[in-house]
Amino acid sequence: MSKYAILGLVLVGTVASLDFIGRTQSAAIKGRLVCEGKPASGVKVKLMESDNSFGPGFLDSDDKMASGKADSHGEFNLSGSTKEITGIEPYLVVFHDCKDGITPCQRVFRVNVPKSYTNSGSSAKKTYDAGVIELAGKYPGETRSCLN
């Protein structure tokens, strides 16, 4: 790649991170987490926005839009906004220990929020219902995290 192309990419990333261009966009997601059919209370969830246009961690890291924990019924409801030049790509991250035994760290997987559930503005106009999510199974792309 030429030095001008690299310089251009760095410049675009720098300008985007200055937060004076782009538009505020929002998303919301709700659902119910269960472990072997029982409410998974206290499970940490985050609503994130993907900034991996050029590959993971290149120029801009993913933005945290909201975070919280599942209530005593395993239910969660997150809503947040972020400023981006292009359309946002929100997703839910779930950190849990269901069926994990004494394995260190937590199991982590993500659920994408459909683009049709995003909008311009600082508050979400509709909420994506992820339904009941059973944590006992293994999810595609599931990883582990000790830092969350």
UniProtKB/Swiss-Prot annotation:
Keyword Glycoprotein on entry: yes
InterPro entries found in the cross-reference section: Transthyretin-like (IPR001534), Transthyretin-like_sf (IPR038479)
GO cellular component: cell surface; extracellular region
S-S bonds: none
Residue ranges of the TM segments: none
Keywords: Glycoprotein, Secreted, Signal
Signal sequence coordinates: 1-17
Keyword Glycoprotein: yes
Known glycosylation sites: N77
Classification via Gene3D superfamilies: 2.60.40.3330
Organism superkingdom: Eukaryota
Compartments (UniProt record): Secreted
Family: Belongs to the nematode transthyretin-like family.
Name the UniProt record assigns to this protein: Transthyretin-like protein 2
Highest classification ranks of the organism: Eukaryota, Metazoa, Ecdysozoa, Nematoda, Chromadorea
